[in-house]
Amino acid sequence: MERAQCLRKGILSFERSLEQRSLILSPRLEYSGAITAHCSLDLLDSTNPPASAFWVVETTDTEDEREKKREITE
């Protein structure tokens, strides 16, 4: 699977998970962290079920976000 296609599927999966958890961000709220996605394709031999793909999407907080969380918890 090409990288761009994998990234698109990962982002769509991430958006769906936000919708399911009712964590959709307000249009005015900007996210300044990074969203990363990677894809792993497991190819199995002919005696096993068909190949399967796994998408993992992560968000990474910016340093400012981590600092705010530290201040809140202290």
UniProtKB/Swiss-Prot annotation:
Lineage top rank: taxon: Eukaryota
Protein name stated in the entry: Putative uncharacterized protein encoded by LINC01549
Protein's organism: Homo sapiens
Higher taxonomy: Eukaryota, Metazoa, Chordata, Craniata, Vertebrata
